[in-house]
């Protein structure tokens, strides 16, 4: 992918954990939906009962079984329209369906169902509030997600799901110590895949890869279903991929696909490994299958960048045009995509627009991911001194992210800080020489030029 493309994809996926795990947990807690079996969930291993008497435990879900559950709940509500818990369950299911299908038109449906639940039962309705927090996270409104999660936890302080969603929002807002506290509370209430995967990501953000690996291994060990195991194996593969370990990454993705072939991020993992190994036909096949089945913008961008790297310009432009169509669809359904599109725009010729998007986002939240995108947009519009400030901030936690080091290295080179640029570009390629279909070769070329150029 481009300079920040794979990182953008990972950001989108990680933000999606809030939607996926949160809504799965809520759906699993409603008897009207029944046992929602299948694959693609992120369920924890232990079921507890929250303060309002509903089971606070996730369930594995597929698009098909979820669609059936939605239809079942809709029929029930036509017969019993005053059933406020079922309206909350329906709202959570719509949020989950949006994530599984990459169709944001489910978000307004979720909004309506949750509003109906609260209208019927305005006091003490932690179910609807937690679902609203999950909806806000799905729309990338993390300030709203935090506010709603806190409101739900004020009613039910023993909701592990509530603490998980709160922690997710805090991570996206750049409030990392507070996020750690929320995840620890979640882990105290219900240790399992949901809490371990979140703690793993927080460790990864801080550059603590042994802890991140350990927590994901715990997530895998406690996975109560093949679907949950597939989820854990995907992120174990991501840890290996982001460290440049192709063999382990491939093994984890393949294990995950054997465990849960319907979990489509695993297909993306396999495709990028195939691309890195030069298995062009297999990579093209898997990327095409991926975007056909789950046309989320991050996957379409990644596929387009791979096509660009193969000099298939017309095919790549068709994918990039699809990104613009999807952008409009997401925005009209209330989804904030400024962060994701800022990196895409910066790398694909719309640098002024990228700076506007990144500036808007950095005023909303100060996570290291936002600061990295802002730094890159500043650089691409010629503001390198300011860009370096934010590139330093992006790496302040110690995250071992090749794209971030590449961005800072390019900025340093533009400022004539040659030795620092060489160090950062070398680090980027040492972390993962395949970190981007487009930027990794650029990093290698720039490093070679700087290394062989006269020093000032």
Feature names for model-found ranges:
Residues 85, 92, 126-127, 161, ...:
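Start-of-helix register in tetratricopeptide repeats
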Residues 92, 99, 134, 168, ...:
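Residue-level recognition of tetratricopeptide repeat
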Residues 3-127, 147, 433-434, 441, ...:
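N-terminal leader/linker segments that initiate helical-solenoid repeat arrays
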Residues 96, 103, 138, 172-173, ...:
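Register position in tetratricopeptide repeats
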Residues 81, 122-123, 157, 190-191, ...:
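Short coil turns that delineate tetratricopeptide repeat
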Residues 89, 131, 165, 198-199, ...:
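Canonical tetratricopeptide repeat
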């Amino acid at each position: 992918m481009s300079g920040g493309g794979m990182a953008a994809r990972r950001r989108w996926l990680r933000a999606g954990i809030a939607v996926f795990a949160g809504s799965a947990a809520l759906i699993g807690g409603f008897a009207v939906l029944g046992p929602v079996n299948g694959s693609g969930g992120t369920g924890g291993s232990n079921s507890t009962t929250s303060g309002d008497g509903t089971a606070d435990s996730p369930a594995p879900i597929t698009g098909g079984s979820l669609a059936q559950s939605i239809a079942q709940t809709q029929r029930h509500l036509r017969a019993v329209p005053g059933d406020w818990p079922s309206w909350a369950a329906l709202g959570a299911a719509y949020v989950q369906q949006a994530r599984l299908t990459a169709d944001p038109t489910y978000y307004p449906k979720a909004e309506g169902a949750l509003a109906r639940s609260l209208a019927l039962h305005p006091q003490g309705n932690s179910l609807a509030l937690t679902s609203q927090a999950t909806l806000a996270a799905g729309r990338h409104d993390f300030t709203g997600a935090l506010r709603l999660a806190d409101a739900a936890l004020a009613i039910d302080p023993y909701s592990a799901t509530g603490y998980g969603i709160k922690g997710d929002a805090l991570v996206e807002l750049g409030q990392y110590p507070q996020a750690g506290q929320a995840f620890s509370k979640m882990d105290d209430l219900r240790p399992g895949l949901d809490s371990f995967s979140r703690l793993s990501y927080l460790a990864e953000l801080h550059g603590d890869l042994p802890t991140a690996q350990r927590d994901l291994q715990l997530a895998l060990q406690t996975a109560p279903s093949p679907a949950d195991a597939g989820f854990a194996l995907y992120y174990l593969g991501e840890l290996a991929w982001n460290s440049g370990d192709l063999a382990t990454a491939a093994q984890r993705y393949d294990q995950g696909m054997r465990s849960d072939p319907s979990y489509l991020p695993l297909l993306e993992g396999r495709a990028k490994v195939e691309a890195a190994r030069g298995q062009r036909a297999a990579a093209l096949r898997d990327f095409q299958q991926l975007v056909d089945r789950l046309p989320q913008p991050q996957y379409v961008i990644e596929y387009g960048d791979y096509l660009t790297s193969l000099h298939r310009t017309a095919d790549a432009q068709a994918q990039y045009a699809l990104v613009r169509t999807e952008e409009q669809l997401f925005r009209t359904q209330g989804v904030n995509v400024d962060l994701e599109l800022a990196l895409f725009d910066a790398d694909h010729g719309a640098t002024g627009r990228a700076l506007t998007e990144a500036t808007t986002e950095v005023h909303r939240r100060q996570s290291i991911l936002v600061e990295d995108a802002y730094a890159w947009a500043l650089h691409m519009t010629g503001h390198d001194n300011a860009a370096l400030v934010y590139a330093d901030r992006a790496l302040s936690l110690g995250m071992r992210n090749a794209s971030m080091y590449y961005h800072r290295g390019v900025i340093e080179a533009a400022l004539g800080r040659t030795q620092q640029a060489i160090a950062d570009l070398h680090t980027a390629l040492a972390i993962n020489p395949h970190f981007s279909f487009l930027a990794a070769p650029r990093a290698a070329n720039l490093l070679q030029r700087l290394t062989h150029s006269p020093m000032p």
